[in-house]
Amino acid sequence: MSPGIGLMKRRLEKEKDAIALAVSGISKKYNIQPENIKTLETKYDSDAGDWYVALGWDDLRAIVKMDSVLAIITEIKEI
């Protein structure tokens, strides 16, 4: 039996960890240099254990959803 989300150790404990993973994912997917990506907003959903990071570069914007326990990107949505 595995522990609930509240009892599991989170790999993305801090906002800066979530931002780093989000920037890395965007940079790989869109072939953009990380220094050209700006952080617009971050949010942590404590119920689901997910981080949401809004990033912007050139004329594009995206929201990156990440699982804080597994430290993986679960969704990238352009806005």
How would you name each of these model-derived features?
Residues 1-5, 77-79:
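Short acidic DE-rich linear segments
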Residues 32-79:
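Exposed beta-strand-loop-beta-strand "reactive/processing" segments of non-cytosolic proteins
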Residues 3-38:
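Short, non-transmembrane alpha-helical segments in secretory-pathway proteins
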